Amino acid sequence: MDEFHRCGKEDSFWQQCFLYPLFFQEDLYAISHDHYLDVSSSSRPMEHLSSNDQLSFLTVKRLIGQIRQQNHSIVLFVNCDPNALADRKKSFYSESVLEALTLVLEVPFSIRSKYSVEGMNECKSFRSIHSIFPFLEDKFPHSNSILDARIPYSIHPEILVRTFRRWIRDAPSLHPLRSVLYDYRNSPENLQRSIIVVPRVNTRFFLFLLNYYVCECESILFSRLKRSSHSRSLSHGSFPQRTHFHRKIKHIIIFSRRNSLKSIWSLKDPKINYVRYGERPIIAIKGAHLLVKKCRYYLLIFRQFYFHLWSEPYRVCSHQLSKNCSSSPGYFLRVRMNPIFVRTKMLDELFIADLITNEMDPIVPIVPIIGLLAAEKFCDISGRPISKLSWTSLTDDDILDRFDQIWRNLFHYYSGSFDRDGLYRIKYILSLSCAKTLACKHKSTIRVVRKELGPELLKKSFSKEREFDSLPFSSKAAARSQRERIWHSDILQINPLANSWQKIQDLKIENLFDQ
């Protein structure tokens, strides 16, 4: 495999490489066999793991031969009866073949991703979910509209195989992939004409399909946007508005027309910014409403032309940042005006200038979060705290730790908001719900619980505030916390409550367009 990676540095070679012989490498199936046992051993009961789960390379070769035949289809996506030994062995070898197929297809995909990203400084990938917000703070205040483009998941298996054919010219290596996709589509759990590119049964296989599908969409979209941006020429050959010349010269490129002595001046378009978190791209645009409509129309036509997909209207939504709020991962995003007063003194005269700048203002969705807490039985629908009866069987330390963990995660995730008053309302709900839970467990009252525990009840709840007070210039921490935001870079996934609220928002939009 390492030798294959080294040989893949040449584009002309790895696009025409022969991947099908890799299916008959015993080392490949040894790797997939070990990976399958590691994953399945954590999910299957001990009685289902037997010493007979040994890999037979001869059986694997027979399965590959069955895949190549149209009349013999192996079942990869049906839940087999664990009591039937034959079904279990069949599922075992099917999973091994599926793991090997994923390993083979990951080779050209990893090489392509590595060499396509090189030289593109604007395409960066970060692990933290909060790495998106510094980019939004830099780009959003200069934009007036955003496009919330959601990636469609349903795609026909043959269209998905054709996208692989653009980069893999070894046709026999795609026959197993085609058989697997059609087998999944025709399974009793998924009787439909399209395949859903989301992780469901085999996590590694479907994660690979999702990553490849998103990468293919972005690569084609970026190339088209760059081509359209560089091909638009100005109606006049002179510079547009010579004011701020040094600023605008950075966004102007010159290229010569063939068989002509004249040069064409073209503007790089710095007004369209693209960012994606997970499977949800966001495009920030600065321009007239007609430009926003053209970009939205282009995205819809782009998906229909390249992937033969009919995108529903709600898949590409446009918002004006000055009037509406857009829902980002767990936040309401808007742009607010921030007035700044500048005093300039020249000799004996004093001038006061009033400047207005735009600033991104992320808002914490307090009311929806309280509704989610009510659904989890921490409070009622009006926000009144109640006891968590399902936790009364736990120890006191476990109850305190669970409530403390919920508050820590919320405060840690929403530390980037200016207004934290709503967070302290949620803190009040959680602390009082914790006291009521302990009182219900000990068949006592809240006053007795607070008297017995004392500061221990609220000690952990104030731990996050102490972290902010320990920052430099702690004497001004209280006033500074209302003006500054802290984006923590160690958050690798969205908060569960914020994720639930985001799914509810997406479902509301889908239901709105389905009516």
UniProtKB/Swiss-Prot annotation:
Which molecular-function annotation in GO is an example for this chain? Answer: RNA binding
Source organism (scientific name): Pinus halepensis (Aleppo pine)
Give the family, as the similarity comment puts it: Belongs to the intron maturase 2 family. MatK subfamily.
Instruction: Fetch the PANTHER family from UniProt.
Output: MATURASE K
Key word Ligase present = no
Name of the protein: Maturase K
The subcellular localization recorded is: Plastid, Chloroplast
Q: Which domain of life is it from?
A: Eukaryota
Summarizing the function annotation, the protein's role is: Usually encoded in the trnK tRNA gene intron. Probably assists in splicing its own and other chloroplast group II introns.
- A single cellular component GO annotation: chloroplast
Name the UniProt key words of this record, in alphabetical order: Chloroplast, mRNA processing, Plastid, RNA-binding, tRNA processing
Its GO biological process terms? Answer: mRNA processing; RNA splicing; tRNA processing
